[in-house]
């Protein structure tokens, strides 16, 4: 149960909150995700994330998040058909990507811009009825892999590849990115990574989405706000730095000296620690398995051994376990995603979780309006200032 609201007529003063950054503050009730931080457990709609990642199809879990129940075979087929019909990007998006799909433009800025453009092109964007929001969500979910893949190719000076109507959602992602049909184990690996990144309760980007849609702004504005939050290095942006870090270290035997220097310099290494999980991130072990299998035939197989050594060193020296970004970065690199697209990849799968929260917020909406503890001066007079003229 959320705390009682502070009366707006009373100045908010007094002791500081128990934790900065709203640590431990319950902002809403939700039936989407349960995180047990001390135990290192994660559940989507009551299902353990380990079970979903190992046995479910990404689109099955999307349906679960959006509708609160497992899809029937007929519902799953219908969902696939709707996505297949909407995967192609509008011509206006291709025009914009020709302008901003360049190496000097931050990929997340491009994804943010195109998402906003898609909202401007959607004639029902301002309709907040559940059916209208779901229609917009299906269209955006279908197009996100197309967008990220097209952006990646434009940044390399290559033409985008149209989706293959014979391929499913996950397989098409790799096909559009690389130009060749993926192997089955690659599809399985990417499916696992997408499930593990698709939702994570009330993190900064999800809270941003719920706050925006709580004002009865439109679906695309809420998703764009979430993308803006995810872009930050303290949130999703950290994943982009993992592979460059491992490449810089180079060899497993170089890890101890590298970590010692980094800690002496006060550096924080990406991929370690989490605000909620103190003992272990349940997603990390599953992603380590994906990374190990995919890296066995990747161009840089030695990176996995560097990662294992670094994980052990950080746990011994700092007590910090690997988080969701760490091995996901290795898995994505092995699949052909360049590091600068890793955060954009998260957008393409996390849009499912953001949408679930947007739907839940709209179903029982109340404007999100917290208060601040005032710590400044009071009772100042303009007349007391020597520079003030009457």
Located regions from the model:
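Hydrophobic alpha-helical bundle cores within soluble ligand-binding/oligomerization subdomains
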Residues: 2-390
């Amino acid at each position: 149960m959320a705390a009682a609201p502070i009366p707006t007529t009373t100045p908010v003063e007094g002791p500081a909150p128990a934790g900065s950054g709203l640590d431990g503050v319950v902002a809403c009730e939700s039936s989407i995700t349960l995180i047990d931080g001390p135990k290192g457990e994660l559940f989507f709609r009551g299902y353990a994330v380990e079970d979903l990642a190992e046995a479910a199809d990404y689109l099955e879990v999307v349906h679960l998040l959006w509708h609160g129940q497992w899809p029937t075979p007929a519902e799953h087929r219908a969902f696939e058909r709707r996505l297949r019909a909407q995967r192609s990007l509008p011509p206006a998006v291709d025009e914009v990507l020709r302008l901003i799909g360049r190496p000097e433009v931050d990929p997340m800025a491009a994804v943010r811009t195109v998402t906003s453009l898609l909202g401007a092109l959607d004639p029902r964007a301002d309709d907040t009825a559940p059916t209208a929001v779901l229609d917009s969500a299906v269209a955006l979910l279908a197009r996100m892999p197309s967008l990220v893949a097209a952006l990646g190719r434009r940044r390399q000076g290559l033409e985008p590849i149209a989706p293959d109507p014979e391929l499913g959602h996950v397989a098409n992602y790799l096909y559009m990115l690389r130009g060749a049909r993926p192997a089955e184990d690659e599809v399985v690996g990417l499916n696992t990574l997408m499930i593990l990144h698709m939702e994570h309760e009330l993190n900064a980007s999800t809270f941003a989405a719920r706050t925006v849609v709580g004002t009865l702004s439109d679906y695309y504005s809420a998703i764009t706000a979430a993308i803006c939050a995810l872009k930050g290095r303290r949130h999703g942006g950290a994943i982009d730095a993992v592979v460059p870090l491992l490449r810089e270290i180079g060899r497993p035997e170089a890890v101890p000296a590298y970590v010692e220097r980094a800690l002496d310099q006060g550096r924080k290494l990406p991929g370690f620690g989490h605000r909620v999980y103190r003992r272990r991130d349940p997603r990390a072990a599953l992603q380590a398995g994906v990374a190990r299998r995919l890296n066995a035939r990747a161009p840089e197989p030695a990176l996995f051994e560097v990662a294992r050594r670094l994980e052990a060193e950080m746990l011994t020296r700092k007590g910090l376990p690997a988080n969701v970004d760490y091995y996901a970065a290795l898995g994505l690199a092995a699949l052909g995603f360049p590091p600068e697209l890793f955060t954009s990849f998260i957008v393409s799968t996390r849009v499912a979780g953001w949408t679930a929260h947007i739907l839940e917020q709209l179903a029982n909406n109340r404007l999100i309006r917290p208060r601040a503890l005032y710590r400044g001066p009071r009772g100042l007079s303009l007349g007391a200032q020597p520079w003030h003229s009457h």
